[in-house]
Swiss-Prot record:
Keywords: Cell membrane, Membrane, Protein transport, Translocation, Transmembrane, Transmembrane helix, Transport. Residues 46-88 are annotated as: Disordered. Signal peptide: none annotated. It comes from Corynebacterium diphtheriae (strain ATCC 700971 / NCTC 13129 / Biotype gravis). This is Sec-independent protein translocase protein TatA. Residues 46-56 have a biased composition (Basic and acidic residues).
Length: 88
């Protein structure tokens, strides 16, 4: 979409007619605030995504670590032995 100088001038004239010369600075200020809020929300959403991915990775690491835990060594219990009784 290529806008030439005449198209840009026409758009500016329409904007001035719609908002009026007095309200134009307020409208620009409001637009700037809205853009700033939008950018901060987008940045926060990407940070939330990164935190979620980090949590998922930590959960996977924890699950792998739990699978690798070795059962404690079991000490064999002494088995009863056959004792021969003396014959009488």
């Amino acid at each position: 979409m290529n806008l030439g100088p005449t198209e840009i001038l026409l758009i500016l004239v329409i904007v001035v007619l719609l908002f009026g010369a007095k309200k134009l600075p307020d409208a620009a200020r409001s637009l700037g605030r809205s853009m700033r809020i939008f950018k901060s929300e987008v940045k926060e959403m990407s940070n939330d995504d990164q935190r979620y991915e980090e949590q998922q990775q930590q959960r996977q690491i924890a699950a792998q670590a739990q699978q690798q835990v070795v059962n404690p060594v079991e000490i064999p219990q002494p088995q009863p032995t056959d004792i021969q009784r003396p014959q009488q």
